[in-house]
């Protein structure tokens, strides 16, 4: 089913993005991952596969549209096509709104929302050719607001709205668009250090398997918005 398919995962050097890339690669999908640091990109790519014909590491920042255009061009030159895009890159700062700086606000909006647009804008023509799939990784914070989350909530509410509107726009090209909204995930996000204490949380590979299941669905069906949370709360 996945023979010769190619996926691009932004923020793919660790956490959710790496978990998704590893699962897709294990299923025979050729993967390109991006990150902001060369050493992180190289290390993650080597962990995904030692075969350069199956994995491509790219240094890119989703806040830079030209960098995302270049990333897609590299993918096409290396693999010849692009079938799946998983827009995963994201960040968060959690402070009361009166303490949140302008720079912190802009960092979140430019990464979590504008970066999402840049990634889709840079890849959409290739997805038209392949009649491919675009998935954004948003958050339950895109529908549930909370204390100290004003900037993060705004960016993730926006990400959900953007992705759902894009889904309607792109259906006529046979491009499928979904957004995944995870709850607590065991990653390094917000200074967390994954350990045994995180065993109750969603694991990155769980999201990789979810993405894989979405790609396996009959093409007549489109799971446009998916909430996923730990099955049991942390006690």
Task: Show which residues each predicted segment covers.
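C-terminal helical subdomain
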Residues: 179-180, 196-235
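Active-site helix of classical SDR
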Residues: 120, 155
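Residue(s) in the substrate-gating loop at a strand-loop-helix junction
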Residues: 139
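The beta1-alpha1 cofactor-binding region of Rossmann-like NAD(H)/NADP(H)-dependent oxidoreductases
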Residues: 59-71, 102
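Conserved glycine-rich cofactor-binding loop
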Residues: 13-15
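Substrate-binding pocket helix/loop in short-chain dehydrogenase/reductase
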Residues: 96-97, 104-106
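Conserved glycine-rich Rossmann-like NAD(P)H-binding loop of the short-chain dehydrogenase/reductase
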Residues: 27-44
């Amino acid at each position: 089913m996945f023979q010769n398919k190619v996926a691009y995962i932004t923020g793919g050097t660790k956490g959710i993005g790496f978990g998704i890339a590893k699962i897709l690669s294990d299923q025979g999908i050729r993967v390109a991952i991006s990150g902001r640091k060369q050493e992180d990109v190289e290390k993650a790519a080597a962990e995904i596969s030692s075969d350069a014909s199956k994995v491509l590491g790219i240094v890119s920042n989703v806040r830079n549209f030209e960098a995302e255009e270049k990333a897609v061009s590299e993918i096409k030159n290396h693999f010849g096509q692009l079938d799946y895009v998983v827009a995963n890159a994201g960040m968060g700062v959690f402070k009361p709104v009166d303490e949140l700086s302008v720079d912190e606000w802009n960092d979140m909006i430019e990464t979590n929302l504008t970066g999402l647009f840049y990634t889709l804008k840079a890849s959409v023509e290739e997805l038209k050719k392949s009649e491919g799939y675009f998935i954004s990784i948003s958050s339950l914070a895109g529908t549930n607001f909370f204390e100290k989350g004003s900037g993060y909530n705004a960016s993730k509410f926006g990400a959900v709205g953007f992705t759902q509107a894009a889904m309607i726009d792109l259906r006529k090209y046979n491009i499928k668009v979904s957004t995944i909204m995870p709850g607590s995930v065991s990653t390094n996000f917000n200074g967390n250090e994954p350990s045994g204490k995180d065993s109750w949380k969603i694991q990155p590979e769980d999201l990789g398997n979810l993405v894989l299941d979405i790609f396996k669905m009959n093409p007549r069906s489109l799971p446009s918005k998916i909430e996923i949370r730990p099955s049991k709360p942390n006690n």
